[in-house]
Amino acid sequence: MEWKIFIESFAGSGSIGLEAISRGAKRAYFVELDRNSYQILLKNCRAVDMEKCQTVQGNTFVQTPLFIDFLKNSKDEIVLYVDPPFDYRDGMEDIYEKSFTMIKNIDVDNIYMIIVEHVSTLEMPEVLGRFSLNKTKKFGKSALSYYFYTQE
């Protein structure tokens, strides 16, 4: 993780991005919509290293592409962590499809890896835009799928 930029979408408390900072990530960007979770995220960032945290309260599908666009000319490699909520609430039934579309629309060369956390029963696409599935690790009811940039 050393010297990489980390973006955590659907950040919640920010635990994954903050762990990336503790392992040497240069900076972490967090997107969280829920007001209560966002307040916890801010508190956690202050406790770790606020200088390395950039937070935004807002819609992941709007804010994450803005972060990616902002960082497109960075020489640093980016790791994008996408963790849509498992519990489907009204209006969120298509959360995975929207997440896949967001990933498919990424058109920058400096994203090193995309990690998608998901329910383990979900069959993940082999290809999402410019990114190919490398492996999936299952942990009970959840799983992590790792996508890497595919050179054209």
Name each model-derived stretch.
Residues 1-152:
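Class I S-adenosyl-L-methionine-dependent methyltransferase catalytic core
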